Amino acid sequence: MQRSITYSFAGPADKNQVRRLLSECELPTLYIHRHLKSFMVARAGKKIVGVVGVEVYGRTGLFRSLCVDEAYRGRGIARMLNERLLAYARTRKIDRLYLFTLYAEKFASKLGFRKIDRKRIPKSIRSTWQFRKSHSYPSVVCMMKKIR
């Protein structure tokens, strides 16, 4: 029997499962606790099988950590998490989302993100640890999506 997937904001009790899933997807877990309330999770029963987050910096946001448990891929979970995150971003009056990626440029493009020059990234996003760390990897791609 296939379990139905439910979606909700992450709560403090979800921190360990979110960290586990991000680690399995080889995504950073640093500072998750600071932004957990703006992460969305997908659940199959009590198990978190998908996650996505946004760090809010005024009218800009840093898109974080979209991943789905390997056993649950191909079911539209990533797309649904993305849609719910965009709806949340709109309620927060975020105009633009930024992301940094090494491997997911093609997938991010399918979600409406476009490659941009790092010089176009606003100061609020340049102050994040992700931006600072991106300088360590010359192949990191900077992307942006307008959502208004």
PLM region spans:
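Conserved beta-strand in the GNAT
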Residues: 41, 47-55, 60-67
